[in-house]
From Swiss-Prot:
GO terms for cellular component: cytoplasm. Associates with the EF-Tu.GDP complex and induces the exchange of GDP to GTP. It remains bound to the aminoacyl-tRNA.EF-Tu.GTP complex up to the GTP hydrolysis stage on the ribosome. Belongs to the EF-Ts family. NCBIfam families: tsf. PROSITE patterns: EF_TS_1 (PS01126), EF_TS_2 (PS01127). It comes from the Bacteria. GO terms for molecular function: translation elongation factor activity. Residues 81-84 are annotated as: Involved in Mg(2+) ion dislocation from EF-Tu. It is found in: Cytoplasm. The gene is tsf. Keywords: Cytoplasm, Elongation factor, Protein biosynthesis. This is Elongation factor Ts.
Length: 198
């Protein structure tokens, strides 16, 4: 399939990739736009991993108040430079993350933030459920691991499916932004407020 300038332009707009990167990805994907995006994301993950160790001390605090003024979110999203913090792309990312928190009510930023005692309690609940269902002992641990992943998707912001595109997780959204903006990006912390709740 012939790769057109329009296809390259569209892929660049969607991913922030360079001209040659976009062209190569489209060629590799035989012109399939979605496959090309996946190829670039896979390559972008490598770029993002290289940037992950860099210190992110700049950034913004995004505030979101839901219609009706009964629900509000504050989220701190950090990057490496104030230049990136002022970009529309970074501000949109912070806003999307605030909307995610408002809609999906995560309890923690990442898996690493979940206290060990909470994980142990969940494992015990699953273990008891599975024994009561008569599951064989040798498969229980594997099932528990799968259930824990589902638990993380519910309570950890970075593991949640992104509300605007459930095909990707919030961490993938951040990885894409790291690739586009060329800086490490970190969700530092958040708070979600609901009128009448403690």
């Amino acid at each position: 399939m012939e790769i057109t300038i329009e296809m390259i332009k569209e892929l660049r707009e969607r991913t922030g990739a360079g001209v040659m990167e976009a062209k190569k990805a489209l060629e590799e994907a035989n012109g399939d736009m979605e496959k090309a995006v996946t190829i670039l994301r896979e390559k972008g993950v490598i770029k993002a991993a290289k940037k992950a160790g860099r210190v992110a001390k700049e950034g913004i605090i995004e505030a979101y108040i839901h219609t009706g003024d009964k629900l509000g979110v504050l989220v701190e999203v950090n990057c490496e430079t104030d230049f990136v913090a002022r970009t529309d792309e970074f501000r949109k990312l912070a806003k999307d993350i605030a909307l995610q928190i408002a809609g999906m009510n995560p309890q923690y930023v990442s898996k690493e933030d979940v206290p060990p005692e909470v994980i142990e309690k969940e494992k015990e609940i699953y273990r008891t459920q599975l024994k009561n269902e008569g599951k064989p002992e040798h498969v229980i641990e594997k099932i528990i691991e799968g259930k824990l992943e589902k638990f993380y998707e519910e309570v950890c912001l970075l593991e949640q499916p992104f509300v605007r595109n459930p095909e990707i997780k919030v961490k993938d959204l951040i990885t894409e932004a790291i690739s586009k903006l060329g800086e490490n990006i970190v969700v530092r912390r958040f708070a979600r407020f609901v009128v009448g709740e403690d």
